[in-house]
Amino acid sequence: MRRVVITGIGLITPLGANAEASWAKLLRGDSGIKPIESFDVDDLPAKIAGTINELDSVEGAFRPDEWLEPKEQRKIDRFILLGLVAASQAVTDSGWLPENDEDRIKTGVIIGSGIGGL
């Protein structure tokens, strides 16, 4: 059996919703750490975090509806959606376009997460 590894990168980070946006902002010196605005932090010691931005007004924001219907999103943990999108990006980035079921079956993705429900 011949073994082949085709690599691609997929990222959903506090800097952007793909590798290109994240890398460009990183090189620019931007930080993904910002004040937490999505919930009340008055009783918490930490007031800042690196969160995934979903605001339409923000450059490079993650737009989950572009990947999965809202009804389907409610059925899975948010971290699973982020992992699936990053995996899809990685396969696309690799340039691997399997044309038959045999090649599709041989396709795999390795996912890493610093924290979350993966």
Task: Locate predicted features.
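Conserved "HGTGT" condensation-loop signature of ketosynthase/thiolase-family condensing enzymes
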Residues: 1-118
